[in-house]
Design a protein with these regions (language model features):
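ASCE RecA-like P-loop NTPase motor cores
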Residues: 1-595, 634
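Acidic, low-complexity intrinsically disordered tails
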Residues: 1-2, 438, 571-646, 651-662
Length: 662
């Protein structure tokens, strides 16, 4: 099926020229191109038009889950009839395995997997196997090791109507591809058997499958609702993919175990020859235990550290990743490339330094080093045609594109870059408060960037006390719950968002009319010219958009940012005058896909949950503590341990406080 872009938009402003130039470059075989698109110029629409015209599978690479979720939502709207998929890390919480020699401290791996994200990852690889009209929106998770596509596809269970096959053979094959039989609790990754009917709930789909047999022949193949059992559609052929990307062929498992034992013997001898007997004994015990688990259960804790043996790779050879699931002619768009490219560079180095200690001190075999993300050079060899997309391209992109940059400065809405005003630092908090109140009266939103977490929290606390509805956002409030936070800002549930590095989000917030940058003259990463341009651009989607920089010194970064903003404003205003365009604010739907995935809430200083009611008698206090204890036990039963711990701490605080009753 071809890509079919569904949109009321038509290319306007610079979009038509940018699309034509980039498509021509791709057709001419250009491997690297850069799209310099200002905030609100419709870069996502430009990418969508390029994909539609070239009709090739595409990988859209974003630098965090929040931006990836936003892009996924937009591409889903542009291509409702095509396969738009989402591929990010499936961990809600992840503590990697590590060893700290200075304190002789071993930290075991801990992780909480988000099943919804796991389903979306599996759905992404299924789409790449089954169709060419696939767009995968991904974070840097795409350069981390994944099961090999050959092994994953090789273990596929393909069923056809009229096929001669025994019921026992189908169930045996389902177990081989890691599905569990569970006739009572029908959930993702399980199957159940009722007479000659087998029902399978795959890990990559919302719906389940029903296989009806007549003797040893498949009579009917259907898609069913897993809750009600109603038939949605019928199939002539039905492929059932393995439960996990890390499925291992039975014959490969035996070879892998032999290979692990061989490596263990060599490594033990080397450690003993160096006089490191403790490390030798440790690696012997740990590896033998893991192998017994693999033999009996088919799995062990940390099995990914043996991935080189299971995939049959040579030492040092890169692991299979999502990139290996794409056909050779796929396109790569690296969004916010000035941030994403350095992130891709750093992944391998960070992973290697942690693993080296584990190997050196006998916690892992040397082959564990090959369970890693791709080096940047390996990533480059797996991508054949790349478009870097950014308002402030970095030196790598400009060098790779040989300085040839396609500019997209004119916004389809006619909006020009926001006016930038510089004000003194002294009195910045109260001066900003007055500006915030003006925006609140007009039902507009405000973004504030500060330099430290402490300042974000303190400023949020101060503004909340004086009646401003505000939230703060920093690195401790990570992952996809930010989608909910940003949606609530747009809805008007609060008016001010305070953060440290808001520019990195690629935030699409048309309701924001003011961006305030506190301490703008403190030179550094957060106040570089690129960072300032990105942050100022957050107000570029509003007709009254404005930026205030609080600074006492005109730094080189501020000067460069002002010069670039002025250049863009001049070009935009000239275009509007020439074509008689009246600027209008960007209007965008509040709907956000993927919000249902989020479980954690953001930090809210005005939350009523933590408020302690007033007590008039000791009985009221005792009654309230009793209610909290009941809630705590209930939370523990549901495995909501964070909530239970918070309630426990609240109870402890109440019991240690002295109350004066009237």
């Amino acid at each position: 099926m071809d890509f079919q872009l569904v949109s009321d938009y038509r290319p306007r402003g610079d979009q038509g020229r940018a699309i034509q130039e980039l498509v021509s470059g791709l057709a001419a075989g250009e491997q690297h191109q850069t799209l310099l698109g200002v905030t609100g110029s419709g870069k996502t629409f430009t990418m969508a038009k390029i994909i539609e015209q070239l009709n090739r599978p595409a990988l859209i690479l974003a630098h965090n889950k929040t931006l990836a979720a936003q892009l996924f939502h937009e591409f889903k709207q542009f291509f409702p009839d095509n396969a738009v998929e989402y591929f990010v890390s499936y961990y809600d919480y992840y503590q990697p395995e590590a060893y700290i020699p200075s304190g002789d401290l071993y930290i075991e791996k801990e992780a909480t997997i988000n099943e919804e994200l796991d389903k979306l990852r599996l759905s992404a690889t299924r789409s790449l196997f089954e169709r060419r009209d696939a767009i995968i929106v991904s974070s840097v998770s795409c350069i981390y090791g994944l099961g090999s596509p050959e092994a994953y596809y090789g273990m596929l269970l393909l069923l056809e109507k009229g096929q001669k096959i025994r019921r026992e053979d189908i169930t045996r094959r389902l177990v081989e591809i890691l599905y569990e039989r569970n006739d009572g609790d029908f959930r993702r990754g399980t199957f159940r058997v009722r007479g000659d009917v087998i029902e399978v709930y795959p890990t990559y789909d919302e719906m389940a499958y029903r296989i009806e047999l007549f003797g040893n022949e498949i009579d009917t193949l259907s898609q069913i609702d897993p809750l009600f059992g109603t038939v949605r559609q019928k199939y002539a052929r039905l492929p059932i993919y393995p439960k996990s990307h890390y499925v291992v062929q039975p014959e490969r498992k035996k070879t892998a175990i032999e290979s692990i034992l061989e490596e263990l013997g060599v490594w033990e001898k080397q450690l003993e020859s160096e006089g490191r007997l403790v490390e030798s004994q440790r690696i012997h015990q740990r590896t033998r235990f893991d192998l017994e688990m693999i033999k009996s259960m088919g799995y062990c804790h940390g099995i990914e550290n043996y991935s080189r043996h299971f995939s049959g790779r040579l030492p040092g050879e890169p692991p299979p990743t999502l990139l290996d699931y794409f056909p050779r002619d796929y396109l790569v768009f690296i969004d916010e490339s000035h941030v994403t490219v350095p992130q891709l560079h750093g992944m391998w180095h960070g992973d290697r330094s942690r693993k080296q200690n584990l190997v050196d001190y006998g916690f892992r075999l040397p082959s564990a080093m090959d369970n890693r993300p791709l080096k940047f050079e390996e990533f480059e060899t797996r991508t054949h045609q790349t478009i870097y997309v950014s308002a402030t391209p970095g030196p790598y992109e400009l060098t790779k594109s040989a300085g040839v940059v396609v500019e997209q400065i004119i916004r389809p809405t006619g909006l020009v870059d926001p006016e930038v005003e510089i004000r003194p630092i002294r009195g910045q908090i109260d001066d900003l408060l007055a500006e915030i109140r003006l925006r609140v009266e007009r039902n507009e939103r405000v973004l504030v960037t500060v330099l430290t977490k402490r300042m974000a929290e303190d400023l949020s606390g101060y503004y909340s006390e004086v009646g401003v509805k505000c939230r703060y956002m920093h690195s401790e409030i990570e992952t996809l719950e930010r989608v909910r936070l940003l949606r609530d800002l747009r809805r008007g549930e609060y008016d001010v968002l305070i953060g440290i590095n808001l520019l990195r989000e690629g935030l699409d917030l048309p309701e924001v009319s003011l961006v305030a940058i506190l301490d703008a003259d403190k030179e550094g990463f957060l106040r570089s010219s690129g960072s300032l341009i990105q942050t100022i651009g957050r107000a570029a989607r509003h007709l009254s958009g404005r930026a205030i920089l609080y600074a006492d010194v005109m730094t080189d970064s501020i000067r460069r940012a002002l010069d670039e903003t002025d250049r863009r404003r001049t070009v935009q205003q000239a275009h509007n005058e020439e074509h008689g365009i009246t600027p209008t604010s960007i209007m965008r739907s509040l709907d956000m896909s993927l919000v249902h995935i989020l479980k954690a809430e953001y930090a809210d200083l005005t939350s009523q949950d933590d408020a302690v009611p007033e007590f008039n008698t000791q009985q009221e206090l005792d009654s309230y503590i009793g209610k909290l204890e009941s809630d705590m036990r209930e939370a523990a039963k549901k495995f909501e341990f964070e909530k239970a711990a918070k309630l426990r701490d609240n109870i402890k605080d109440l019991r240690t406080k002295e109350f004066l009753f009237s």
